[in-house]
């Protein structure tokens, strides 16, 4: 298939494995630019020019899991651990709202200390502020998810990382792809807006694996999809591996937009870490969400999923004004509401 034929098939929504694999495999600048343009047009048509701002508070870097790629893994003895108090978390959320955030994202390692009741109490307090609450806390029993939904949580982000069960087990030895999927299906069933997403460039990952990720996202019609490159952390077993490729990751974002026209897709912080201006580029290739770091100092320097993370040493109230300026410079506008998924596209 020629590049033109692939683009025509994508426009006709002929999402065969062959088409997606060819789209990811072609290493041609002209094709890539046409793919990004198509994704941007679909983004504009179905989710518009608003960029939704989700202020993320990383409230604990304690984690019971031992994922091979993650700097928060429990065997990383070089990381100074922290836990924010519930009062600190709520006050930080209040400040984000004052700065204009319409969604608060609470993210942590899998830290049993807060589970489930402390999280419920925090969610209830933040919901009084009139904003959406997204949780990104990992894999927990169904009853925890139920409690948090009853407390008022609106969304849950649980990236599947890779849909290859063998690779998943190798990289995440404490758990399995099956368990991850069961959690995602439970979250959907409970009425959460549910987010998945993958890492690009994982050691041992193939183009076929990336195609499986895209087909998995399409099959389950996720409301949110976060995609970012693998970035090796020096205090993990994958320290010496190669980082994920920016352009290939960008193509995954673009194809996700084409597959899921009205889902919310962030320009992830990792994209801005491996390439200067990477988030802005991603917002021009299908993304419509940005997640400014709202973790207060000194904690923000310690939430080390990967090294070199941007926006860590800036003033800890700089990020929301910064992304608002970024959105303006792109000719877009900040979202005016909670930015939930609006189903305007009928999936075929």
Curated annotation (Swiss-Prot):
InterPro entries referenced in this protein's UniProt entry, alphabetically: Aldolase_TIM (IPR013785), BATS_dom (IPR010722), Elp3/MiaA/NifB-like_rSAM (IPR006638), FeFe-hyd_HydE_rSAM (IPR024021), HydE/PylB-like (IPR034422), rSAM (IPR007197)
A molecular function (GO) term: oxidoreductase activity
Function text: Required for the maturation of the [FeFe]-hydrogenase HydA. Catalyzes the reductive cleavage of S-adenosyl-L-methionine (in vitro), suggesting it may contribute to the biosynthesis of an essential sulfur-containing ligand that binds to the hydrogenase active site [2Fe-2S] cluster.
Domain Radical SAM core intervals: 49-268
Catalytic EC class: oxidoreductase
CDD domains linked: Radical_SAM
Keywords: 2Fe-2S, 4Fe-4S, Iron, Iron-sulfur, Metal-binding, Oxidoreductase, S-adenosyl-L-methionine
Family: Belongs to the radical SAM superfamily. HydE family.
Cofactor binding summary note: Binds 1 [4Fe-4S] cluster. The cluster is coordinated with 3 cysteines and an exchangeable S-adenosyl-L-methionine. Binds 1 [2Fe-2S] cluster.
Enzyme Commission number, as recorded: 1.8.-.-
NCBIfam families found in the cross-reference section: rSAM_HydE
Binding residue positions for [4Fe-4S] cluster: 63, 67, 70
Listed cofactors: [4Fe-4S] cluster; [2Fe-2S] cluster
Gene Ontology biological process terms from the UniProt entry: sulfur compound biosynthetic process; water-soluble vitamin biosynthetic process
Impact when changing residue 70 to A: Eliminates binding of one iron-sulfur cluster
Binding, [2Fe-2S] cluster: 311, 319, 322
Oligomeric form and interacting partners: Monomer.
The name this protein goes by in its record: [FeFe] hydrogenase maturase subunit HydE
